[in-house]
């Protein structure tokens, strides 16, 4: 190998990864063709009153080209409430919600995606799966987060009307490209923080088993515990339609 090639490789090594490359690695690391889990949610309001909810989650496809159905299984008053999410590679998702008590489905308009999803601290937008190419990224530096070396990235949506958030900051674990924390801002004001913990390797995919979502203004938070998680299961596209939304699996 000649000296020019050695100098070129050295320059590439010194340059390191760009913010876009890091974000792409995060997405590629978590790629699977399907996913199923059961979730237990502890919703704590500003008075520390805790309400428990449970749901099931199923997905087919992968980032930017996937469909998912989230269905509440408890408590009894919201059992059967379900959300169909159709994610797209180049724009915000399409969403429909089924409410058994009303026996009707409703399309969730883009301007309503900032609303809380059935009393949790997740917004409808937070439940989407967006492709990395829908954002511009900037590397803010390297930081220790909970004694873990991380990259700190900034992301901004390319289509500003497609997101309630003007900017987000992400802490990404350098060892395995797992997101540990996301801070979401609206017009430079912190509105929502998501922490990811209990990281486990499941079917060769590093996966957070616990998510904590904090609504800063409401002073409330939701802790989601993921159980019975399986990737790459056999599912059919026909299970992810508005008709399927109306019927429990």
Predicted features and spans:
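N-terminal mature ectodomain segment of secretory-pathway/periplasmic proteins
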Residues: 18-101, 138
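Residue-level detector of beta-strand structural context in well-folded domains
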Residues: 135, 140-141, 168, 197
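Hydrophobic h-region of N-terminal signal peptides that target proteins for export
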Residues: 7-16
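Bacterial N-terminal signal peptides that target proteins for export
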Residues: 1-6
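Short, ordered beta-strand-loop transition motifs
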Residues: 60-66, 141-149, 202-203
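Short, solvent-exposed mixed-charge patches
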Residues: 248-249
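A short, amphipathic edge element
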Residues: 20, 51-52, 128-139, 190-193
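Gly/Pro-enriched, hydrophobic low-complexity segments
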Residues: 16, 73, 84-86, 94-98, ...
């Amino acid at each position: 190998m000649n000296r020019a090639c050695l100098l070129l490789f050295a320059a590439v090594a010194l340059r390191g990864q760009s913010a876009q490359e890091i974000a792409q690695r995060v997405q590629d690391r978590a790629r699977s063709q399907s996913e199923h889990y059961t979730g237990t949610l502890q919703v704590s309001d500003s008075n520390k009153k805790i309400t428990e909810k449970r749901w099931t989650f199923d997905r087919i496809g992968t980032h930017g080209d996937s469909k998912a159905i989230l269905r509440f299984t408890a408590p009894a008053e919201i059992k059967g409430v379900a959300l169909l999410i159709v994610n797209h590679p180049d724009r915000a998702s399409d969403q429909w919600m089924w409410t058994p008590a009303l026996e009707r489905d409703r399309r969730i308009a883009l301007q309503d995606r900032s609303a809380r999803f059935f009393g949790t601290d997740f917004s409808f937008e937070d439940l989407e799966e967006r492709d990395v190419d829908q954002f511009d990224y900037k590397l803010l530096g390297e930081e220790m987060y909970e004694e873990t070396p991380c990259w700190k990235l900034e992301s901004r949506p390319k289509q500003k009307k497609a997101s309630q958030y003007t900017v987000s900051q992400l802490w990404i674990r350098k060892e395995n490209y797992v997101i540990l924390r996301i801070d979401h801002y609206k017009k430079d004001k912190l509105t929502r923080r998501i922490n990811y913990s209990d990281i486990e390797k499941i079917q060769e995919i590093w996966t957070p088993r616990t998510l904590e979502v904090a609504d800063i203004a409401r002073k409330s938070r939701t802790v989601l515990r993921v159980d019975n998680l399986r990737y790459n299961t056999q599912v059919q596209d026909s299970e992810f339609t508005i008709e399927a939304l109306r019927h429990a699996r």
